[in-house]
């Protein structure tokens, strides 16, 4: 029988003074071992002795000799190694081949979690202690194991679910049980404790020292503490923060709690200690790093080594290689930053001189996890990929500039021929798939699943590429294969909706969450499937859906929001955070800052809504009091992606731009009120003098170019291409400005430079026509489509080049042209329309949607409701044709009492006059209309038919103009066609909101713009209030109709596909009156739409398009977005200011006869 050993603790097991390695943390209930020979000698060890440490090795080695380390590894149970290390790495990060010293220190701390003492301590202890015999079996049985009482603790008795208990390793459950009561008392939930159990040592540290942590880090949340503690050196990192937080909060860094926790979570204990030790050197000369830069570098695996390397190499890289400190920081601020910096120092000259890359491209490649390996692979494969596979250096750089760039480049080299030859993909599509984190895996999955998804599930190769071209594309493709049948058959989604959900970062999780929550959100919360799809179709869709399920009742019942507004907030990247911030800040912003709930929703309904709301709370008083902005202007700036940065930049640059550059605050606001407003403002500050002095532009033209999404890039491209386009291609500066003054101006200018000679020489277009096509959002895509389809449409479909140009010269020109190619035969042969009528419908913003709606509703309107095809065409040919036709169908199918008295002819005339806004305005009740009707009846008691034009004739005249193939001749031809004098025709047009100049040139404004003029001329629309005026709720409701007026594309029904053009048309409608002079107006045959003063940006402009992932181009404006599916857009736009402020300023008031004509059209 084995002898009973003494329980006197060995010196190696005694707690040492000072900080303990993770796994040997002291606890409050740790007692002192009884002396040898005591009454408890020989009994099994007390469980309290092992609660915060893992089991001891069966037998210590005599000394740390040559073979002792291998013995230690044999004794080490691999299951004890904390896998949270790998969870904390990027999902497709680079695989580093070098192990830094500090990283090895942390690996050793993981080994110490097995209760093995440090090697130096073992040398000292075992030298004075002879080797022990093999432990007795009974002693081994006393150790905690899967079969021991410690491992069999049932945590369900403490309220943990079975699933939560299974997530906790058996050997850790006793530690969880020991500290459960203390942690729960500190406010930690069961889920928090389960997460913290990933690193058992942190359980005791947090339980014992939570009060000290809150004292040192008062803003720390439970989630933040758990986020640090569950890391592989989390307990030590928290201990380090307790020691150094006070000094790091003071000069020179003055870090806040969030920054301190970020360093501790991502960089570990070594990073915290390094920041503390080197804080003065990092922020002083010659490095002069900002606190934000120090945090960025330190907040990664290997942060300590990166900080050390920055101190050594930053001066060298800046002085000898021409990099900026910002570029050096960008390279260092990733996992493996040390190795990346050293590789940039070594390879930058080679890549630039021998391979033709720019320093910026080298920095882009290096500024990712695994930058070292990516740079080396670019050096090796760039010649091969370009010469043998036909890629451009830019495409190679795009592939390499992601985590895992090395593997992606190697996979492109291997699979590009296969994917192109066997699967029909283009090199551009292969590059798009590869240019993301995890590009290697995505390419391999496309190779495996493309045939299956296309043949068995009916997807197109383009849809498969869209799904794969995101982070996590591999998983998304596999999930689409698994869930597409279920989501379509059981939940009623379309394949297109499934693709939309999957084509984002986290598409796999979003699809699974839609499967789980779609029935709940629809049945319990009243959402439509389209709204659920809209929420899910963004990065982080899973989290957004779960948050909508949780917060929708609260936001609606406690805060008065509508479900549509909640959907609008959630339907963006970061929707979860935006919803939570609205819940928290809505009362504050409304009560303390005077904003309306609608304005708060508008700010939140963008990517980065959370940060924008927090910045509005902070800067609204400053911008209004110190800089003279109005709350409306602050909201306009904030209501874009990147609103936070735009607001901060306005605060910084408004005085400079106004005082040094002569801009007005209104112009600064106009520039800032777009996605990328920060960058646009900075570029205006930098390039305004150059563009004005060297290129002859006016400040107003510079502002016009900058006042769009992508304003920075557009300004830089104008600086570069203006001389070329004017000297080599014969354009005027005004034409260049017109092209650049739209979303995607950069791409449009570059495409004009490339295609102008081709379109003019090979296709017979004039430079003016090319400029007209390019001068819209999506001009690049429209020009490329004209080049491709002009021969087809003219030869196969009988259109003229002028008609093709007319279709292309609108927002969404590309989808309109493609739809004409597809539907022209159908509409002419099956529905009896003429090619001229099809062209008239297509030649407006949203032409694609209007054509599809005519195809769908023409039989219904004609057969079931008695309208003529000419009437349908007249409604569809006025801009905003789709919503106008849908409103007519809805009224004829389910009459609204406000419109019930109108005949079909009256309804058609009203729809032609003002589209859906006119019909909606009458339904809601026109302000002042009853008094106006009475006044008119009193003053003109006898209204005879000769005093007013026949309403049917108005429809015929409008339809004639819209379908005329030569607009400039339409006026003269109309006089002949209808037997009208010049004065009579002008009088008719004036009654429908058209000026003499517009009528004579044949370029009629959209219906909603004409309706706006009619309302103002008739006195039924209030003048624009001053920015400082306020409205009572009664006033606001009285004039609600005016706030709902839309331009060409009105808010679609949530049951229909959204108009991508909606955002672009509103953007384009901003008047250059505040930012451009008359010189910006072009004399093209195709009208350049009026633009609106950016000061009064309607909140509905905040709906943004998804970004493209490759090629640098903007999304095609005709592409439907998930956001358009949300009914929230309609409600949002009901709060908008009139989108055509100033459009009717010069339109004179109606006289009494004109009022009488109008009143005869309206319900009495």
Curated annotation (Swiss-Prot):
Subcellular location as annotated: Secreted; Host nucleus
Documented effect of changing residue 1104 to T: No loss of HR activity. Reduced HR activity
Region entry Acidic activation domain AAD, spans: 1135-1164
Motif mapping: Nuclear localization signal NLS3: 1104-1107
Comp. bias intervals (Basic residues): 131-141
Pfam families: TAL_effector
GO molecular function, one term: sequence-specific DNA binding
Signal sequence annotation: none
Start-end of each Cryptic repeat repeat: 255-288
Motif, Nuclear localization signal NLS2: chain positions: 1067-1070
Sequence ranges of Low complexity compositional bias: 142-151
Comment field on protein domains: The N-terminus is responsible for protein export from the bacteria.
Family named by the database record: Belongs to the transcription activator-like effector (TALE) family.
Protein name: Avirulence protein AvrBs3
Organism of this sequence: Xanthomonas euvesicatoria
Lineage, broadest ranks: Bacteria, Pseudomonadati, Pseudomonadota, Gammaproteobacteria, Lysobacterales
Originating gene: avrBs3
């Amino acid at each position: 029988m084995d002898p009973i050993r003494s329980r006197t603790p060995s010196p190696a097991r005694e707690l040492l003074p000072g900080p303990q390695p993770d796994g040997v943390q002291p606890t409050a209930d740790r007692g002192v071992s009884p002396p040898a020979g005591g009454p408890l000698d020989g009994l099994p060890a007390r469980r309290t002795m092992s609660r915060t440490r893992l089991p001891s090795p069966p037998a210590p080695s005599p000394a740390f000799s040559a073979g002792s380390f291998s013995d230690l590894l044999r004794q080490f149970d691999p299951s004890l190694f904390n896998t949270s290390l790998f969870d904390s790495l990027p999902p497709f990060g680079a695989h580093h081949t070098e192990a830094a010293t500090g990283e090895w220190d942390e690996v050793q701390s993981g080994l110490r979690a097995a209760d093995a003492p440090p090697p130096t301590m073992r040398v000292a202890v075992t030298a004075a202690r002879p080797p022990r015999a093999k432990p007795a079996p009974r002693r081994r049985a006393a150790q905690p194991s899967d079969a021991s009482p410690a491992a069999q603790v049932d945590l369900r008795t403490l309220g943990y679910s079975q699933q939560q208990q299974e997530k906790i390793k058996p050997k850790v459950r006793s530690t969880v049980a020991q500290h459960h009561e203390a942690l729960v008392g500190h406010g930690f939930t069961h889920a928090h404790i389960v997460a913290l159990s990933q690193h058992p040592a942190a359980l005791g540290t947090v339980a014992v020292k939570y009060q000290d942590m809150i004292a040192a880090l008062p803003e720390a949340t439970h989630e933040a503490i758990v986020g640090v503690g569950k890391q592989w050196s989390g307990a030590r990192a928290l201990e380090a923060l307790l020691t150094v937080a006070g000094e790091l909060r003071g000069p020179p860094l003055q870090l806040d709690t969030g920054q301190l926790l970020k360093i501790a979570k991502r960089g570990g204990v070594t990073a915290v200690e390094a920041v503390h030790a080197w804080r003065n050197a990092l922020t002083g000369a010659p490095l002069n790093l900002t606190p934000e830069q120090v945090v960025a570098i330190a907040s990664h695996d290997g942060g300590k080594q990166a900080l050390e390397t920055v101190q050594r190499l930053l001066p060298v890289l800046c002085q000898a290689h021409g990099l900026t400190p910002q570029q050096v920081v960008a390279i260092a601020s990733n996992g493996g930053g040390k190795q990346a910096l050293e590789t940039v120092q070594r390879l930058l000259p080679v890549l630039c001189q021998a391979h033709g890359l720019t320093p910026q491209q080298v920095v882009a490649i290096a500024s990712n996890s695994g930058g070292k390996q990516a740079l080396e692979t670019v050096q090796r494969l760039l010649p091969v990929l370009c010469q043998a596979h036909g890629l451009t250096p830019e495409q190679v750089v795009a592939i390499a500039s992601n985590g895992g760039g090395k593997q992606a480049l190697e996979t492109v080299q291997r699979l590009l021929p296969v994917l192109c030859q066997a699967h029909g993909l283009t090199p551009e599509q292969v590059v798009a798939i590869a240019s993301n984190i995890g590009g290697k895996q995505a390419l391999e999955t496309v190779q495996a699943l493309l045939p299956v998804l296309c043949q068995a599930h009916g997807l197109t190769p383009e849809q498969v590429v869209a799904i794969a071209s995101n982070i996590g594309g591999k998983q998304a493709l596999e999930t689409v294969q698994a869930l597409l049948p279920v989501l379509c058959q059981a939940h009623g989604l379309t394949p297109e909706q499934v693709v939309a959900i999957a084509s984002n970062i986290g598409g796999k999780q979003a699809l699974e969450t839609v499967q789980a929550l779609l029935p709940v959100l629809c049945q319990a919360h009243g959402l439509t499937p389209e709204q659920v799809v809209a929420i899910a179709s963004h990065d982080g869709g899973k989290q957004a859906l779960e948050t909508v399920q949780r917060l929708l009742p609260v936001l609606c019942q406690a805060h008065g929001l509508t479900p549509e507004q909640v959907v609008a907030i959630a339907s963006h990247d970061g929707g979860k955070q935006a919803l939570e911030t609205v819940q928290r800040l809505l009362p504050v912003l409304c009560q303390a800052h005077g904003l309306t709930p609608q304005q708060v929703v508008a700010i939140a309904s963008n990517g980065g809504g959370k940060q924008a709301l927090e910045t509005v709370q902070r800067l609204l008083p400053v911008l209004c009091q110190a800089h003279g902005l109005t709350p409306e202007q602050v909201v306009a700036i904030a209501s874009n992606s990147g609103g936070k940065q735009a607001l901060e930049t306005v605060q910084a640059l408004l005085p400079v731009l106004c005082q040094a550059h002569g801009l007005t605050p209104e112009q600064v606001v106009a520039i800032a009120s777009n996605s990328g407003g920060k960058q646009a403002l900075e570029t205006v500050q930098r390039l305004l003098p150059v563009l004005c002095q060297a290129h002859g532009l006016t400040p107003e033209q510079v502002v016009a170019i900058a006042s769009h999404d992508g304003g920075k890039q557009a300004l830089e491209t104008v600086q570069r291409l203006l001389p070329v386009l004017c000297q080599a291609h014969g354009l005027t500066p005004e034409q260049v400005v017109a092209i650049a003054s739209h979303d995607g101006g950069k791409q449009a200018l570059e495409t004009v430079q490339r295609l102008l000679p081709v379109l003019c020489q090979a296709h017979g277009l004039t430079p003016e026509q090319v400029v007209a096509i390019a001068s819209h959002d999506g001009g690049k895509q429209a020009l490329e489509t004209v080049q491709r389809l002009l021969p087809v449409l003219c030869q196969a479909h009988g259109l003229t080049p002028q008609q093709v140009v007319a279709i292309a010269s609108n927002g969404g020109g590309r989808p309109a042209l493609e739809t004409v190619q597809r539907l022209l035969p159908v509409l002419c042969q099956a529905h009896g329309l003429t090619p001229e009528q099809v062209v008239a419908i297509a030649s407006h913003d949203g032409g694609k949607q209007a054509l599809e709606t005519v195809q769908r509703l023409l039989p219904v309107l004609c057969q079931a409701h008695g309208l003529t095809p000419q009437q349908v065409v007249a409604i569809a040919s006025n801009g905003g044709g789709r919503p106008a036709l849908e409103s007519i169908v809805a009224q004829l199918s389910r009459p609204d009492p406000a419109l019930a008295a109108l005949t079909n002819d009256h309804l058609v005339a009203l729809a032609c006059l003002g589209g859906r806004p006119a019909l909606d305005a009458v339904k809601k009740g026109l302000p002042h209309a009853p008094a106006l009707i009475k006044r008119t009846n009193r003053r003109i008691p006898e209204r005879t038919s000769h005093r007013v034009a026949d309403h049917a004739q108005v429809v015929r005249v409008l339809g004639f103009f819209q379908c005329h193939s030569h607009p400039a001749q339409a006026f003269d031809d109309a006089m002949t066609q209808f037997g009208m004098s010049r004065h009579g025709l002008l009088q008719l047009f004036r009654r429908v909101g058209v000026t003499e100049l517009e009528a004579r040139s044949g370029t009629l404004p959209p219906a909603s713009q004409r309706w706006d003029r009619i309302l103002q001329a008739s006195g039924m629309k209030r003048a624009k209030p001053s920015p400082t005026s306020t409205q009572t709720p009664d006033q606001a409701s009285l004039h609600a109709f005016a706030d709902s007026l839309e331009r060409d594309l009105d808010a679609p029904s949530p049951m229909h596909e959204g108009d991508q053009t909606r955002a672009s048309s509103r953007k384009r409608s901003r008047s250059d009156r505040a930012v451009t002079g008359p010189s910006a107006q072009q004399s093209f045959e195709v009208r350049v739409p009026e633009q609106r003063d950016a000061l009064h940006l309607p909140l509905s402009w905040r709906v943004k398009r998804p970004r493209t992932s490759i090629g640098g181009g903007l999304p095609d404006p005709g592409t439907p977005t998930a956001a358009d599916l949300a009914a929230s857009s309609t409600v949002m736009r009901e709060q908008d200011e009139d989108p055509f402020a100033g459009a009717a300023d010069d339109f004179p008031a109606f006289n009494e006869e004109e009022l009488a004509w109008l009143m005869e059209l309206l319900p009495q």
